[in-house]
């Protein structure tokens, strides 16, 4: 298959691919820049690299350049601690990290995009096609594409089953998991999203979710497959985002529930040009749904995973009006079912489709992930008689705070290493702003300084993972077989 960006440069070259409000790149511009950079990246002789990047045009150029150079990209969550980043990258044998943000990480070759020069200049200069720096182009049907000469040609096609990106996820026990996402996975996800949500070449999608998350990267993939425009934004600011919605003909936007709430508080009381507001990352409250629908906002709730390359369940406004607790119906190109449903129809959600990863890169010895071709999500769900899917527990003990997944096992492991703590468990605590925040229960025979404990945890965990609530207890609830009864702490 032709590289999607190459195809768009040929067929849709003058259409705006990406804009940050200051600079805009057509698909021709984007392909030109990515191709030039790709030739330089090849000199590093890496088949897999880490990316430590922000939401910027230069980051998007870097992503496409890596793919044009046949380099797999391992996305790094910029909120992680150096130790967490190191463990992730070493587990998948990454030796070199390209970055658009300052980074110091021992044990790796760190290369800033600002330091990569090609054809006598820096990538950060906007290179238009009338200044091609020695690369020859030919014109056909008013579209300018590189001539295919041995001295400058890059691969313009790829194998759908090659790994495009790698992201890390985790269960609540055990090590972090490396998820390989192939071009086929991304393509199937984009097609499923187009059918269930809807977008076309005239779409103008505001993307403020981090590119290192699948929710952010998937917008870029949908754009380059379909040929629409992405309005990239690095930081969420409700006032600024609302101004963009009003003034820049934004048709689509991806948000987590809390950011939608902030936008409504800021004054998003009508849709303007918005056709779709795609929500995910945390549960929607019935109150928020009611308020949004009263404003005629086109909200679409969704459910997806890193392993499924973003959403595979989508609820339309009509579905949410009928049943506010639903995450909708599956995309047409996936199949879902409930494993071992109880008398209420609740059981583990299983999914099968081309959007689903094949196997974890790390650890390599995981079992029980697939059953007869179906991926076991580990989420407790129900499918009603109309086909609506309800998620009741997202991996049960997984904490979702402001769209970020927080894994209790990591917090508990660090807490148990603090002097004086003999046992600890972390659960989600309700929070009006973030949905949930971590709460740590711990057992200790001595007095523990909360300030010292927080300082210790902050040394080993990303800031958003540090518990916001603490409670000292005499014992933790275990069954006779030694299984921790987290549900008693949720109620407690």
Curated annotation (Swiss-Prot):
It catalyses: 2-succinylbenzoate + ATP + CoA = 2-succinylbenzoyl-CoA + AMP + diphosphate. It is an enzyme of class 6 (ligase). Keywords: ATP-binding, Ligase, Menaquinone biosynthesis, Nucleotide-binding. GO terms for molecular function: ATP binding; long-chain fatty acid-CoA ligase activity; o-succinylbenzoate-CoA ligase activity. GO terms for cellular component: membrane. Its EC number is 6.2.1.26. GO terms for biological process: menaquinone biosynthetic process. It holds the Pfam family AMP-binding. It comes from the Bacteria. SUPFAM superfamilies: Acetyl-CoA synthetase-like. Pathway: Quinol/quinone metabolism; 1,4-dihydroxy-2-naphthoate biosynthesis; 1,4-dihydroxy-2-naphthoate from chorismate: step 5/7; Quinol/quinone metabolism; menaquinone biosynthesis. Converts 2-succinylbenzoate (OSB) to 2-succinylbenzoyl-CoA (OSB-CoA). Belongs to the ATP-dependent AMP-binding enzyme family. MenE subfamily. This is 2-succinylbenzoate--CoA ligase. It comes from Staphylococcus aureus (strain NCTC 8325 / PS 47). The gene is menE.
């Amino acid at each position: 298959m032709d590289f999607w960006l190459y195809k768009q440069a040929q067929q849709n070259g003058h259409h705006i691919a990406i804009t940050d409000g200051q600079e805009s790149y057509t698909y021709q511009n984007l392909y030109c820049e990515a191709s030039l950079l790709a030739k330089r990246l090849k000199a590093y002789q890496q088949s897999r690299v880490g990316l430590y990047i922000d939401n910027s045009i230069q980051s998007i150029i870097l992503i496409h350049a890596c793919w044009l150079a046949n380099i797999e990209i391992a996305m790094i969550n910029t909120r992680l601690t150096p130790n967490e980043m190191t463990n992730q990258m070493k587990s998948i044998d990454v030796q070199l990290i390209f970055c658009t943000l300052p980074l110091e990480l021992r044990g790796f070759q760190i290369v800033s995009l600002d330091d990569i020069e090609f054809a006598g200049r820096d990538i950060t200069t906007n290179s238009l096609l009338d200044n091609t720096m020695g690369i020859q182009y030919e014109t056909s049907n008013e579209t300018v594409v590189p001539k295919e000469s041995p001295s400058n040609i890059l691969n313009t096609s790829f194998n759908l089953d090659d790994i495009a990106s790698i992201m890390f996820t985790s269960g609540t026990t055990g090590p972090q998991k490396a998820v390989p996402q192939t071009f086929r996975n991304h393509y199937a996800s984009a097609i499923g999203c187009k059918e269930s949500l809807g977008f076309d070449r005239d779409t103008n999608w505001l993307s403020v979710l981090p590119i290192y998350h699948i929710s952010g990267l998937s917008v870029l993939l949908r754009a380059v497959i379909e040929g629409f425009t992405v309005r990239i934004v690095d930081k969420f600011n409700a006032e600024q985002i609302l101004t963009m919605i009003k003034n820049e003909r934004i048709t689509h936007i991806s948000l987590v529930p809390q950011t939608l709430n902030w936008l409504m508080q800021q004054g998003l009381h009508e849709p303007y040009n918005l056709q779709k507001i795609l929500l995910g990352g945390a549960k929607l409250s019935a109150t928020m749904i009611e308020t949004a629908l009263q404003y005629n906002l086109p909200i679409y709730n969704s459910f997806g995973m890193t392993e499924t390359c973003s959403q595979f369940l989508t609820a339309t406004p009509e579905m949410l009006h009928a049943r506010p607790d639903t995450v909708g119906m599956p995309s047409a190109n996936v199949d879902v079912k409930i494993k071992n449903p109880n008398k209420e129809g609740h059981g583990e959600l299983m999914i099968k489709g081309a959007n689903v990863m094949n196997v974890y890169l790390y650890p390599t010895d995981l079992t029980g992930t697939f059953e007869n071709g179906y991926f076991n999500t580990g989420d407790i769900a129900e499918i009603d008689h109309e086909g609506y899917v309800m998620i009741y527990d997202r991996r049960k003990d997984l904490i979702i705070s402001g769209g970020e997944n927080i894994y209790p096992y990591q917090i508990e492991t660090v807490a148990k290493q603090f002097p004086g703590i003999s046992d600890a468990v972390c659960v989600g605590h309700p929070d009006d702003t973030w949905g949930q925040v971590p709460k740590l229960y711990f057992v200790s025979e001595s007095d523990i300084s909360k300030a010292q404990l927080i300082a210790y945890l902050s040394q080993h965990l990303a800031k958003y993972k540090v518990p916001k609530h603490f409670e000292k207890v005499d014992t933790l609830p275990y069954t006779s077989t030694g299984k921790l009864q987290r549900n008693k702490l949720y109620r407690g």
